[in-house]
Amino acid sequence: MKLMTNALMMAGSAALLLSTAISAQAAFVENEYICEDIYMEKAYDCANNAIIVEKNRLNKIYNRAYRRLNKVERRQLNTEQLAWLKKRDDKCHFEHDGPMNNTIVYAQIGANVCTATETQKRSKAIAKRYNIQ
């Protein structure tokens, strides 16, 4: 009886740990990038790092989704991705030819934060659509 109780207790503990791990894994961690509110040099690094983090996340999620798809679905996802990239770039793109000043640098920082935020939204949408943890 004692052996059976211990076995049931261990099985219950294992199930609890597994369900906790699964629910922790299932959460999509959203980053909030508030880079514009800090000293310029750190703000610039913050925005650039945000892009790196979010592009890496999107690449991982996209590739995991892509591997699950058949040929037709892959083409569809590629087409959607290209359209999304154009939309994101139209929304967030910043280009300046001329002398740099603080206003221009902060505009670039804002554009980079926009790119990171839009990329994060795309990662979340693909992860949700294809049930990627």
Labelled PLM ranges:
Residues 23-133:
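N-terminal alpha-helical modules
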Residues 12-14, 110:
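Generic detector of short alpha-helix boundary/capping microenvironments
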Residues 1-12:
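Bacterial N-terminal signal peptides that target proteins for export
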Residues 15-25:
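C-terminal segment of classical bacterial N-terminal signal peptides
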